[in-house]
From Swiss-Prot:
Domain of life: Bacteria
UniProt signal peptide: none
Family listed: Belongs to the TrpA family.
Lyase found in the keyword field: yes
Protein name: Tryptophan synthase alpha chain
Species lineage: Bacteria, Bacillati, Bacillota, Bacilli, Bacillales
Active site residues of this protein: 47, 58
Gene of this entry: trpA
Keywords: Amino-acid biosynthesis, Aromatic amino acid biosynthesis, Lyase, Tryptophan biosynthesis
Gene3D superfamilies, A to Z: Aldolase class I
EC code(s) of this entry: 4.2.1.20
Originating organism: Bacillus thuringiensis (strain Al Hakam)
A Pfam family hit: Trp_syntA
Length: 258
C-alpha cells in the first residue's frame, strides 16, 4: 500500500490526527496493544519511534520513552516483528520516525525490506539532510515507501520548496525552533509560515512539535491538513488517560465538518 495508504488518510478534505508512540516503551506487546487502541479510536496514521541513544530532535518525554525501550533490551528487529504481527489486524498507515544511525547499523537494504514486510508506509529521518537523502531515497521509492520531509520555520522558503518538490506522503512542518515537547502556545509567525508552506506544495501539510492541547490541535488543523502529537500522547498513554487521546481525535475530526 505504502504511499497510497497515506494519501487515503487525507482524502476528501479529511484532517489527520497522527499520534506518536515509542517502539518498545513498555515492551512489544504494549506497542501492539497501543497501535490497536489508536486504530480503534480513529487515529489517521500512527507514527512509531525507533529508540536511539542520541536523539537530537527529541524533547525530554520522548527521550525518556526511548531510554526505557533501550534499557528493556528492545531491538529494531523486535519492533519490526511486532509491526508484522499487528499489521494483520489493522489497516492504519504506519510511519516510522528513526534517526539515520539505526538504519545504517541495521543495513539500509535490510531495514527497507523489513519495512515492506511490516507494512510500513512512510519514514521520517530527522537527522538526514536534504543533500544526503539519496542514501536511502531511491531504495524507498522502489519500495513505494514515502520519505517524509521535515521543514522548519527557520528554513528559507527556497530551500523548503526544493525539499518539498521531491517529497511524497505528506510534509511535516515543524512548528517550533528546537526539540519536541509540550508548549503553551504558538507565535503568530507560525501561522504565516504554515500558510506559506501550504501554498508551495500539492502534498498535505502536517504540523508537529509542541502540540499538546485540544486548542493547539484546533488552531493547527484550521491552517494545516493534520497534526502530529508526540510527547503529550506518550504522557497520556503512560498515565492511562486514554479518553483524552480520544478527545484530541474528536477535536481534529470536528474541524473537517467546520
Amino acid at each position: 500500500m505504502g504511499v497510497e495508504r497515506i494519501k487515503a488518510a487525507f482524502e476528501n478534505g479529511k484532517k489527520a490526527f497522527i499520534p506518536y508512540v515509542m517502539g518498545g516503551d513498555g515492551g512489544l506487546e504494549i506497542l501492539k496493544e497501543r497501535i490497536r487502541f489508536l486504530d480503534e479510536a480513529g487515529a489517521s496514521i500512527v507514527e512509531i519511534g525507533i529508540p536511539f541513544s542520541d536523539p537530537v530532535a527529541d524533547g525530554p518525554t520522548i527521550q525518556r520513552a526511548g531510554k526505557r525501550a533501550l534499557d528493556s533490551g528492545v531491538t529494531v528487529k523486535g519492533i519490526f516483528q511486532a509491526l508484522i504481527e499487528v499489521r494483520k489486524e489493522v489497516q492504519i498507515p504506519f510511519v516510522l520516525m528513526t534517526y539515520l544511525n539505526p538504519v545504517l547499523a541495521f543495513g539500509k537494504e535490510r531495514f527497507i525490506e523489513n519495512c515492506m514486510e511490516a507494512g510500513v508506509d512512510g519514514i521520517i529521518v530527522p537527522d538526514l539532510p536534504y543533500e544526503e537523502q539519496d542514501i536511502i531515497a531511491p531504495l524507498l521509492r522502489e519500495a513505494n515507501i514515502a520519505l517524509i520531509p521535515l521543514v522548519t520555520v527557520t528554513s528559507p522558503i527556497e530551500r523548503i520548496k526544493k525539499i518539498m518538490s521531491e517529497s511524497e506522503g505528506f510534509v511535516y512542518a515543524v512548528t517550533v525552533a528546537g526539540v519536541t515537547g509540550v508548549r503553551q502556545n504558538f507565535k503568530d509567525e507560525i501561522h504565516s509560515y504554515l500558510e506559506k508552506v501550504k501554498s508551495h506544495t500539492h502534498l498535505p501539510v502536517v504540523a508537529g512539535f509542541g502540540i499538546s492541547t485540544k486548542e493547539h490541535v484546533e488552531e493547527m488543523v484550521t491552517i494545516c491538513d493534520g497534526v502530529v502529537v508526540g510527547s503529550k500522547v506518550i504522557e497520556l498513554l503512560e498515565n492511562e488517560k486514554r479518553e483524552e487521546i480520544c478527545e484530541f481525535i474528536q477535536a481534529t475530526k470536528q474541524k473537517e465538518e467546520a
